[in-house]
């Protein structure tokens, strides 16, 4: 069975944000504005996305 993937794009800067939110961005593999990564749709990834929802956009692939 194929796992779902999510396309996550950073839309805002991490400068001046909480350290936990910066760590979540790094955990997702995002390093700069307009950087896009594809990640597996798991509960831990969803949790990181929910923490930084205001800095990222998410699409299902």
UniProtKB/Swiss-Prot annotation:
GO terms for cellular component: cytosolic large ribosomal subunit. SUPFAM superfamilies: Ribosomal protein L30p/L7e (SSF55129). The keyword Iron-sulfur does not apply. One of its GO terms (biological process) is translation. InterPro entries: Ribo_uL30_ferredoxin-like_sf, Ribosomal_uL30_bac-type, Ribosomal_uL30_CS, Ribosomal_uL30_ferredoxin-like. The keyword Ribosomal protein applies. Keywords: Ribonucleoprotein, Ribosomal protein. Pfam families: Ribosomal_L30. GO terms for molecular function: structural constituent of ribosome. It comes from the Bacteria. Part of the 50S ribosomal subunit. Belongs to the universal ribosomal protein uL30 family. This is Large ribosomal subunit protein uL30.
């Amino acid at each position: 069975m194929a796992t779902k993937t999510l396309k996550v794009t950073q839309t805002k800067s991490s400068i001046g944000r909480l350290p936990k939110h910066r760590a979540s961005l790094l955990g997702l593999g995002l390093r700069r504005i307009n950087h896009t990564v594809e990640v597996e749709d798991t509960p831990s990834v969803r949790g990181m996305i929910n923490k930084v929802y205001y800095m990222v956009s998410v699409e299902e692939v």
